[in-house]
Amino acid sequence: NESFIKLAQDFAELALNFDSKEDFLAADFNGITVAEKLIEQTGVIGEKIEIRSFERLNGAFIGSYIHAGNKIATLVALSANVEGADEVAKNVSMQAAAMAPIALNEAGVDADTIAKEIEIAKDLLRQEGKPEAILDNIAKGKLARFFKDNTLVNQDYIKDNKLSVADYVKSLDKNLIVTGFKRAALEIGR
């Protein structure tokens, strides 16, 4: 629906001025608050509209990608605005859309997820009959593979799998790094 897309674009533009969801929802939007506009539009289109999350991404250069069909959108922050940053940021944003990483790097993976992955690896190794004495070392290797598959900068770059995403970014400028990313997917019926 064209009017919904326009509303979403207007909200996105307005959201740039706020640091929290609460402040954004309380903001003026043509004489009413954003929260009131959401309720009004829910009545118009017959579907509940809500802002589920609100995060600010900071960086010297922010690139974006919206996947065909407008169901997935990503933002990527780079450490510098160098020539070619727009193309690199878009390509890394496409990577984040396609590969759905859970974190930027190892440091961004929560401790519970790490513990769970180690335990899964150990359980599988036990089922294979591996001795307890070597489980920790093999599980560490499996955890490294988990990080490679599930953290953005460590993933194989989808356009050249000989490079990690971090290496691809550094191919533009040796000091350039990805400092953050956000991935949002449309959830219907929740």
What are the roles of these predicted feature ranges?
Residues 1-190:
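N-terminal assembly/interaction segments in proteins that build large macromolecular machines
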